[in-house]
């Protein structure tokens, strides 16, 4: 089950003030594949990721998933974002008044997962990243690396089919950045997900199955 982009364009503005940010983007990503989107700031990477996540509509073109266009009227984009797509951002965006375990459980609650099941699953995921001793700790007591690991596990909580990561390692040192990318890739492969990550860090390219370079809104061949 691939995620396919066909002739995606995105234009902002009106009349003479229009700016074409994405220009005829075409590629597909298969299940179990982890790709990196790279390119200069302002090249259109984040706009493309927002389109893939259903947060922004393309001006033209199709994004096909499960054989359906994500932007057809029949597709429930709210349900899709909740159940099929996991987002990881540059900032962890943890809720300050929730403990580490609660950060994960609130996502499960929104998806209708029973509390006992959610609690057990949160425990397993946090054990996996070495934070079992931090279950009841609040975000202000966590290091930057710990916060980002919690954010990653939060994205995996509902077992999404697609993981979209926008510069998740930008604020981390080299060792922590490598650890985070290895963690994301491992989940993508073992759970047969589709993984797409934006990064400028060329040291991380070796962990991708493919690197897609975007320049001036176009894929650089």
From Swiss-Prot:
Pfam family membership, one: ABC_tran
Q: In the Enzyme Commission scheme, what number(s) does this protein have?
A: 7.6.2.-
User: PROSITE patterns in the record, alphabetically?
Assistant: ABC_TRANSPORTER_2
Q: Which domain of life is it from?
A: Bacteria
Q: Cellular component GO terms, alphabetically?
A: plasma membrane
User: What is its membrane topology?
Assistant: Peripheral membrane protein
Domain ABC transporter positions: 3-221
Say where the protein is mainly found.
membrane
**Binding of ATP, residues:** 39-46
Q: Does the keyword Cell membrane apply?
A: yes
The family assignment reads: Belongs to the ABC transporter superfamily. HrtA family.
The UniProt entry, under PANTHER family, shows:
HEMIN IMPORT ATP-BINDING PROTEIN HRTA-RELATED (PTHR24220:SF666), IMPORT ATP-BINDING PROTEIN (PTHR24220)
Functional note: Part of the ABC transporter complex hrt involved in hemin import. Responsible for energy coupling to the transport system.
Q: How does it assemble?
A: The complex is composed of two ATP-binding proteins (HrtA), two transmembrane proteins (HrtB) and a solute-binding protein.
> What is the protein name stated in its UniProt record?
Putative hemin import ATP-binding protein HrtA
Task: Give the organism the record lists.
Answer: Staphylococcus haemolyticus (strain JCSC1435)
